[in-house]
UniProtKB/Swiss-Prot annotation:
It comes from the Viruses. The surface protein (SU) attaches the virus to the host cell by binding to its receptor. This interaction activates a thiol in a CXXC motif of the C-terminal domain, where the other Cys residue participates in the formation of the intersubunit disulfide. The activated thiol will attack the disulfide and cause its isomerization into a disulfide isomer within the motif. This leads to SU displacement and TM refolding, and is thought to activate its fusogenic potential by unmasking its fusion peptide. Fusion occurs at the host cell plasma membrane. The transmembrane protein (TM) acts as a class I viral fusion protein. Under the current model, the protein has at least 3 conformational states: pre-fusion native state, pre-hairpin intermediate state, and post-fusion hairpin state. During viral and target cell membrane fusion, the coiled coil regions (heptad repeats) assume a trimer-of-hairpins structure, positioning the fusion peptide in close proximity to the C-terminal region of the ectodomain. The formation of this structure appears to drive apposition and subsequent fusion of viral and target cell membranes. Residues 34-585 are extracellular. The record marks R444, E445, L624, V625 as: Cleavage. Residues 1-33 form the signal peptide. This is Envelope glycoprotein. Residues 490-510 form a coiled coil. Gene3D superfamilies: 1.10.287.210, ENV polyprotein, receptor-binding domain (3.90.310.10). It comes from Xenotropic MuLV-related virus (isolate VP35) (XMRV). Specific enzymatic cleavages in vivo yield mature proteins. Envelope glycoproteins are synthesized as an inactive precursor that is N-glycosylated and processed likely by host cell furin or by a furin-like protease in the Golgi to yield the mature SU and TM proteins. The cleavage site between SU and TM requires the minimal sequence [KR]-X-[KR]-R. The R-peptide is released from the C-terminus of the cytoplasmic tail of the TM protein upon particle formation as a result of proteolytic cleavage by the viral protease. Cleavage of this peptide is required for TM to become fusogenic. The gene is env. A motif (YXXL motif) lies at residues 630-633. The mature envelope protein (Env) consists of a trimer of SU-TM heterodimers attached by a labile interchain disulfide bond. The activated Env consists of SU monomers and TM trimers. Disulfide bonds join C113-C130, C122-C135, C311-C314, C311-C538, C341-C395, C360-C372, C402-C415, C530-C537.
Amino acid sequence: MESPAFSKPLKDKINPWGPLIIMGILVRAGASVQRDSPHQVFNVTWKITNLMTGQTANATSLLGTMTDTFPKLYFDLCDLVGDNWDDPEPDIGDGCRSPGGRKRTRLYDFYVCPGHTVLTGCGGPREGYCGKWGCETTGQAYWKPSSSWDLISLKRGNTPKGQGPCFDSSVGSGSIQGATPGGRCNPLVLEFTDAGKRASWDAPKTWGLRLYRSTGADPVTLFSLTRQVLNVGPRVPIGPNPVITEQLPPSQPVQIMLPRPPRPPPSGAASMVPGAPPPSQQPGTGDRLLNLVEGAYQALNLTSPDKTQECWLCLVSGPPYYEGVAVLGTYSNHTSAPANCSVTSQHKLTLSEVTGQGLCIGAVPKTHQALCNTTQKTSDGSYYLASPAGTIWACSTGLTPCLSTTVLNLTTDYCVLVELWPKVTYHSPNYVYGQFGKKTKYKREPVSLTLALLLGGLTMGGIAAGVGTGTTALVATKQFEQLQAAIHTDLGALEKSVSALEKSLTSLSEVVLQNRRGLDLLFLKEGGLCAALKKECCFYADHTGVVRDSMAKLRERLNQRQKLFESGQGWFEGLFNRSPWFTTLISTIMGPLIVLLLILLFGPCILNRLVQFVKDRISVVQALVLTQQYHQLKSIDPEEVESRE
């Protein structure tokens, strides 16, 4: 992969294996150093400044990538001019000092000439870079000046009617209808051209603006356009090298102590303020590795309990340490950069192993179409696609939580939605026991199952898709989040270790170079140490700047992933993460509360049914008792009696 230029000039070299050591560290870290990710979100500020007065006419900030942060800039012509033009004329008056001058200013056309690329004969700042006709590239004039190569276009906005808007409402003219703050009645709109969106804005660029008058000299003002990108400066460590001190063995399990009832303070004793809790210590290497394996076991045990009756989970000690599983998911669409994607990071990590089939976006080449179950094309427009919680976009330019459709439409970049899993292998007990037994015959190499194959799709499928259908789904999702937190902690510790090694190597190289200079002085008569050793090439190439940049970028990306993970956590899940006693209390009283609620809901109905049933049975018994005590009289038909008579 492509690497940036060396951060320092070439120096004398005493150790030719230095670059190889640095490359080994980079491979160990699993990071590849390239140019900035095109999907990286920055805080970009565009500033328009009057070069004659130094005042800022407009300062607009927005979040976005370096490809689509080119907004329309709105400001007033009088913000560029100030109180007076450089050479006021009688028909212009005092420029923008008075309402009449502001009103007369908007009656004139204007034209703009670039100062960043001055054509022959266009003059300098005194002429506003408009020394002759044909130098103008944009403006608002009857001949419609335009250009195909300039970076901006500047036109008038919606110019208000009447003289009211030219009066300043803040200095006693508020009673005048239409008065505005500052009396701004010459609105301008600055837009970036296609050439401006492709240009480099590393330094300010200058233009000259002139009012067009039929007679006399055209007044001039100069302005600059600057792009400022918020960036995080380098972190400078203070203290001992933490590489060795961080290699701690696994900590012993903490014995749980039952809380004791508080004792009342003795009479007359002064009230004691409890001290602040001790700061939490960062886990050592042993704890981090055990957390990864323990998180893998908990997630596997809740999803496939039959596989964890007796098994061995082994953490792979060589790279790659992580692998990706392509998944299908529903991403969120944002018109502006989300807050969890606004962390300024300039690096990218790559995955050397991606399996499965999932959601792909962009122009996927034929060599990688096997990873795509569904391929979506991005539509026109500028918006951002944020990956669901627990997933990340694996692009041809690196890993990123957010995608910019502007970048996808302008480049050949493509991305796959993946889950990130640690490289943990699953082995049956027979395989592990066989490694320690004495065998004369060996079976063929067994197939190693990794955690990604066993749990792939846990975020977007299976359990996570069934959230709300039962407690098992919630618990399993919780275990998956614990595993993701362990992965994040391990990556952060890996970044810190490599950064400390890089600084140690830099210190060592400085000592070696000092020794080299001393040897050159000793062998000065022979032409220096290189000539005395009869070596043709004796230079030291410092590659530590590459490692330093890579680690700074890795640290910032981890912060970005942490914010994305926290933003994707629901309120119900966060409720149980606040304190352990709250979780225990809820799980203890949840059962009785549910039973009590069911009794209150269905108890009255069941009781009424029971009372009605008892009443019916009692009425039947009463009827039987009355029937036995009385005899029914025989009914006589009157017709039959008459017939007898």
